[in-house]
Amino acid sequence: MDKFVIRTPRIQSSPQKKDPGGKIYKQATIESLKRVVVIEDIKRWKTMLELPDQSKENLVEALRELKKKIPSREVLKSTKIGHTVNKMRQHSDSEVACLAREVYTEWRTFIEKHVNRPSIEVRSDAKTETFRKNAQKLLSEALELEMDHLLVENIERETFHLCSRLINGPYRRTVRALVFTLKHRAEIREQVKSGMLPVGTFVQTHKK
C-alpha cells in the first residue's frame, strides 16, 4: 500500500487588535529608578565633577545623570556628593551652574520632605574593591602620581563603568593596556595628565 503524507493547513491565529487608546509602557530596570542609587556611579560622577580642567560636556553629562537620582542623607554624607554639587553652583559656565542649582535644590527639597525615607543602595563587594585598589595602584605608578589622586580614581572608575561594573576579562585587559600605554608612551601620559586627552576618550580607545 502506498503511503501518503497528508498536509493540513496551519491555523493562523488572528492578530490581536491593538487598542488605539491604550498606553505603551516601557519596562524599567531597578537601577533606572530615581531612589535606587548605585554608589559606584555616584562616586564616578563626583570624580568627573572634581577633576581639574574637566570639559563642559563631561560636567553637564555628570550633572544630568545625578539629576536622575535622589541619594539618601546617608549617601550624601558618605560620598560628599552634595558638597561637590553645591560648589558647582558657582561655576563660571552658566549652563553648568544652572544645572547644578537644579540638582542641589531638588535633592535638598526631597530630603527635607522625606527625612526618614531611605534610598536603596547598591555597593560593590569586598573582593571587587580589592581588585580595583590593585588596579588603581598600577595606574598611579604608571602616571607617576599618588594613589589617591583624582585622575587615578577617575581613570579606574571610567574603566570599571565601561566594563559593566564587573571585574572580568575585559576589565583586566583594559587596565593592562592603559598601564602599558601610560608607562611607555610619555606623550600620551602627559596629554592625560594635562587634560588635553579626556579620560573617557583615553579609556574608550584602550577598552579590550
UniProtKB/Swiss-Prot annotation:
Q: Where in the cell is it found?
A: Nucleus
User: Does the entry feature the keyword Nucleus, yes or no?
Assistant: yes
Record's Gene Ontology CC terms?
nucleus
Residue numbers spanned by region Disordered? 1-22
Q: Which residues form the TFIIS N-terminal domain?
A: 40-114
Keywords for the protein's UniProt record, in alphabetical order: Acetylation, Nucleus
Record-stated family: Belongs to the TCEANC2 family.
Name under which the protein is recorded: Transcription elongation factor A N-terminal and central domain-containing protein 2
Gene designation per UniProt: TCEANC2
